[in-house]
Amino acid sequence: MWSIRLRTLKMIMEASKDSYPMEFGAFLKAEHEIIYEILMLPGTVQGDHHTLFNLYHKGIDFSVVGSVHSHPSGVALPSDADISMFSNTGQIHIIVASPYRISDYQAFNRKSEKIDLKIL
């Protein structure tokens, strides 16, 4: 079962608030299915309905297990673009939604199926 450190989730929520009304996006780093950090890539473009990652800056990092991004709309469900990205970029993906409280998130696997994410 996947878990996330509370401080990491708080950081994601604060970054999402700071980016509002634009989307925030980053990659997730984990060890033994515990997400402990985010990786923000230089050149990431934040828009009102999208986040574009410059993957040339990602490098090879085997601790990167998936992605996180915000939905300023308040709906933490994947769009068609999210579903496509999930299948290509990792094992776990998190969508956080406005107003960005600790409970305003949903986790998904690479098939866009909801999965449990325990907060540590």
PLM regions: where:
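Cys-dependent condensing catalytic cores that perform Claisen condensation/acyl-transfer
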Residues: 67
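Conserved beta-strand-loop surface patch within small alpha/beta domains used
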Residues: 1-64, 73-120
